């Protein structure tokens, strides 16, 4: 969306959910309560996927009026997001497809349907598909980079599974820190964006421990 407030938050290491809560509730970052942050987090993820005031109210157990105020406050805070959503739908209506950051297409034949329910689903996909699809593009590029580096280094460690934005490895103990450096470098620098890609790592005898 190239929203200035979001870019500033990500580039300065500010927790976006806390920042959203701070602006919506008109309090300082330090005064944001866990409940405020929880509501802001739900709004951050829900609104971009087209959640309604009623849907947000149901999810947060608040009134529809409060739900609408949260959504209105969100768009006032992040006008770039609203612009992105509107432009994504408009472009999809003209082309009947949307594209990811690497140019993969998601065709939306129902975007101009006369059926409001069918059309609404296509409109939500017009907004969501470039986001989710671009995330998929980025992690797949990172996986290619990592596999190439593992082979170049002749490591015994192996990449074994991808789960959403997470990669799991079977890591030989002697290669622990080399693998960490290799993986982090590939994932954080595989593509240049207007905000940093940051990675956290963990080790353990099983997936649970690694978290």
Where are these regions (language model features)?
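Conserved catalytic core of nucleotide polymerization and phosphodiester-bond processing enzymes
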Residues: 1-211
């Amino acid at each position: 969306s190239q929203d200035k407030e979001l870019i500033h938050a990500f580039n300065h290491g500010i927790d976006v959910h806390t920042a959203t809560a701070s602006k919506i509730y008109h309090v300082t970052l330090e005064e944001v309560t866990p409940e405020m942050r929880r509501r802001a987090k739900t709004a951050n993820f829900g609104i971009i996927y087209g959640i309604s005031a009623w849907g947000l109210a149901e999810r947060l157990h608040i009134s529809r009026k409060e739900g609408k105020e949260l959504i209105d406050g969100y768009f006032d805070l992040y006008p770039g997001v609203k612009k992105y959503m509107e432009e994504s739908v408009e472009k999809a209506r003209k082309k009947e497809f949307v594209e990811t950051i690497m140019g993969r297409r998601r065709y939306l034949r129902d975007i101009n349907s006369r059926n409001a329910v069918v059309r609404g689903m296509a409109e939500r996909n017009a907004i969501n598909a470039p986001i989710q699809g671009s995330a998929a593009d980025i992690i797949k590029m990172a996986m290619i980079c990592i596999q190439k580096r593992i082979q170049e280094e002749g490591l015994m460690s192996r990449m074994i599974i991808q789960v959403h934005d997470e990669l799991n490895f079977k890591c030989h103990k002697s290669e622990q820190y080399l693998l960490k450096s290799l993986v982090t470098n590939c994932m954080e620098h595989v593509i240049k964006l207007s905000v940093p890609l940051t990675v956290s790592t963990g080790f353990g005898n099983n997936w649970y421990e690694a978290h």
